[in-house]
């Protein structure tokens, strides 16, 4: 605020001499004084120059230190701020639209483009699932078409042109009949659709979800029967068990009953579910309307079927049904041909049976002394886990003959490569070779336990004798042998959907002659049987319309899979429109004592979407007494009309080393959209009229349009090199034009998403003479998104060193026209030095007789140093004074005498 100065500056009065009209004598007196103290006047003048220069330098230093100078009040601030506020409003509209567009392009959950694409992805996924289910359904549909008749069928090997080789496979021109007799193998006659499709893996199935109670005590099984009790498992032989069941009383969804198989029997046969939770899916038990009455699974390890009732039974009574399930041999538990107990437990009721396994002998080959002999069996196919593996057992020379130059070929196909899904290669096939100690102990079922003491692993001896030079064929050179070998094959098949067909061939010669070439082969193909059942019950709620269960055919009907319906895409939830904070008068009178060394590491993780309750976790030690009431709940759309006329003359010496990430919205009463949540607690919001030259190298990426026309005279060179990386998507449209040169070194990485729609109307008339030295070291790492529209009238009293703003106007008009006519004949020796000295009187404030003027910090200092120089020496020259006095006395006498004479003459 400009102080009134009603007296002339020292620089204008420094050499002036007061003149008084006292007659002729005044000339003599003036001359006497001039001659008497002339030298001292020069010294005083010189001293005054030094003083003035020193004062000027000090003032300059103070100016640099305080970063503030006195400026007149800006009356246009309110109007300018209003304009800025209006612009800010329109800018906020644009700013809001831009982030929405960006989010739309980048964020899948909200952008329209992604929403449009989602149904396509879902549809593809559902389509794949549907295809998967369809493939799975086809074999089940073919279940009842299995022809269990077994016939002998010759497999011609002579047509294997792929393996012709003069050295190793010089096949004899024997007739098909001869080869058929030698081969002696039989092949099951099955309809094509009865063979498992290997197009896709079956889904991995968990055990039926039996959340309810075991109701075996309510289920009664009857009419149990086995389709047959004798069969050859090595020729795809199996049987079916069928039974009727009834449920007594009421059961509910989740209740279940069980059926358990004996050791000698399995429900999965040669299909491997070890990689699928050891759980095999069973066809659902359905009624004539294809409604599922019970779901069933089979546990491979415990050999237990679990039938779990569905919601269908909740309102039904007299439930009855029938199931038919295929049974196979357990090759490990029934390794030899013979009759085994097959006692089957259904709902805790035992049904005793006997099953006879007539395994076709694995000891097969050409019937002559050096005839080739070999056989094999696929004993496990993984169709459920998606790993597409199979296991095969090969018996080499099971007749234990003496053979020369023996070669064995393991093929992933039979006649044509393209007709099989088998894959045999160095990467797809693992071979383990065992030497048999006692051939008589070989199993009829082709089961071979690698840990059996009858088997000795010799795989390492054949490392250099196994090759894959023919396509889809593994060749093993056994050389001259007289023992039996077991080869365990772990292979893979592809996903073409073709049947898995394999073939093994052995060729050899008579070791004695090197002639008498012999060759024998064996084919394998995996066949799968399916089972199912049906059931129904009487309606408990509508006894007038009973729906008795129809008789169940032993061959189940397939349960069509329901068509999957794509999940609807969720509608994106729009973000609520922010409601403006009603005139948040955020009277932040921040007393900013702020000597704040505010290290403010304030990691103010304020990703705060500028709800800016500016809780800014500011660890800042900043002792900033900043009474800044600014709870800055500054809901950021705050239309903060802050007409704050804050005259703040605060000398705010605030040494607060403020590294001021403070977006220094300078003109800082300026509604201080001052993103400057500057955690610097340095409260360097300091109303700092801030011309704030604040060097703001501020890399502050902050989009803050901060148009704060902050006239901020605050010459504050606040060198805050603020590298403020402020990824702050700080939509802070806060038009704060912040001329603030704020160098703000605050490395404030501020990822603050501060949407800061701050309408900051900031009419702040902020006269802010605030000398706010604001050195605030506030390291302000403050990520503080705080769009705080905090009207922050922060008068930044900041430690205010307000040095006595005593407006000491010193209007002392002391005219002292002392017309001392002195007609007094009084011989007045009055040394009337006329020390009336208006100059001295003008320099004194009327209220301070000692002349120690105590003006405000900005005026008084300058006037102290600019006081008029002493124009005389206190140790006056006595001679000069005496001489002057004598001359004055003489003049007085002469004047007195002349007047006396004049008086006499008049008389």
From Swiss-Prot:
Residues 1-44 form the signal peptide. Residues 545-555 have a biased composition (Pro residues). Residues 872-907 form a propeptide. InterPro entries: Adhesin_Fg-bd_dom_2, Adhesion_dom_sf, Fibrogen-bd_dom1, LPXTG_anchor, SDr-like, SDR_Ig, YSIRK_signal_dom. Residues 556-831 have a biased composition (Acidic residues). Keywords: Cell wall, Peptidoglycan-anchor, Secreted, Signal, Virulence. GO terms for cellular component: extracellular region. SUPFAM superfamilies: Bacterial adhesins. Residues 45-542 are annotated as: Ligand binding A region. Coiled coil: none annotated. It comes from the Bacteria. Residues 44-61, 68-101, 134-189, 835-846 have a biased composition (Polar residues). Proteolytically cleaved by aureolysin (aur). This cleavage leads to the inactivation of ClfB. One of its GO terms (biological process) is cell adhesion. Residues 863-876 have a biased composition (Basic and acidic residues). It is found in: Secreted, Cell wall. A motif (LPXTG sorting signal) lies at residues 868-872. Disulfide bonds: none annotated. A motif (MIDAS-like motif) lies at residues 272-276. The record marks 197-200 as: Cleavage. Residues 44-191, 530-879 are annotated as: Disordered. The Asp/Ser-rich domain functions as a stalk to allow the ligand binding domain to be displayed in a functional form on the cell surface. Cell surface-associated protein implicated in virulence by promoting bacterial attachment to both alpha- and beta-chains of human fibrinogen and inducing the formation of bacterial clumps. Belongs to the serine-aspartate repeat-containing protein (SDr) family. This is Clumping factor B. It comes from Staphylococcus aureus (strain MW2).
